[in-house]
């Protein structure tokens, strides 16, 4: 019985890793499309979002089956419970990468300095997603804490970009509609960072049994 349970736990980890990898791919491709003005690449991202959604459903089903059939306790229960929470954030990351991709055609291929200012934020967000999934797989508490701390980097990037874009709108030194589109994209990257932080916090819970909400 335990051998079967361990096999299913490994399957859970593998599926969650694949879902995380798809989220990384979605963010990376949306960032690439943004920074290169590649509308065609942006339009190709919708199927990946659907695949991420399907993985969320599959993992949720597996987690519920494990909870009902195996009645896990302690560490195993935390691992499964954390996975159920994490897939919600990963699915939203996929949605936000897709939302970014949907805006890109409206930018009409423009890749000026305002657009390029998104690069550090995009790279930081991708790195946070990658590290949060790795922390889950390795039960690496230090890496999870590093992701949580790194959220400030994304927030600082967002504030910098937002200030510049609002100033651009206020002074009339540019296309206001273009600036608003970029501001929305920046907000999506900032939210991706928040969701990656949530994932890392659930990793911390799976290892320690403690969550920052103190409601667990």
Q: Which ranges hold each PLM region?
A:
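Cytosolic, long alpha-helical scaffolding segments
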Residues: 1-216
């Amino acid at each position: 019985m335990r051998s079967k349970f361990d096999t299913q736990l490994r399957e859970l980890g593998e599926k969650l890793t694949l879902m995380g990898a798809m989220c990384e791919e979605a963010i990376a491709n949306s960032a690439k499309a943004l920074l290169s003005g590649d509308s065609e690449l942006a339009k190709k991202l919708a199927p990946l979002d659907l695949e991420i959604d399907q993985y969320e459903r599959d993992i949720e089903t597996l987690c519920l089956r494990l909870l009902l059939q195996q009645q896990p306790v302690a560490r195993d229960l935390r691992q499964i419970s954390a996975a159920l929470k994490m897939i919600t954030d990963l699915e939203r990351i996929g949605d936000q990468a897709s939302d970014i991709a949907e805006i890109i055609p409206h930018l009409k291929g423009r890749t000026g300095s305002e657009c390029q200012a998104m690069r550090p934020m995009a790279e930081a967000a991708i790195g946070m997603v990658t590290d949060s999934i790795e922390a889950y797989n390795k039960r690496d508490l230090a890496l999870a804490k590093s992701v949580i701390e790194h959220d400030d980097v994304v927030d600082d990037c967002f504030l910098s970009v937002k200030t510049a874009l609002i100033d651009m709108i206020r002074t009339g030194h540019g296309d206001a509609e273009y600036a608003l589109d970029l501001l929305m994209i920046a907000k999506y990257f900032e939210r991706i960072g928040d969701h990656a932080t949530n994932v890392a916090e659930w990793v911390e819970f799976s290892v320690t049994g403690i969550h920052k909400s103190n409601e667990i």
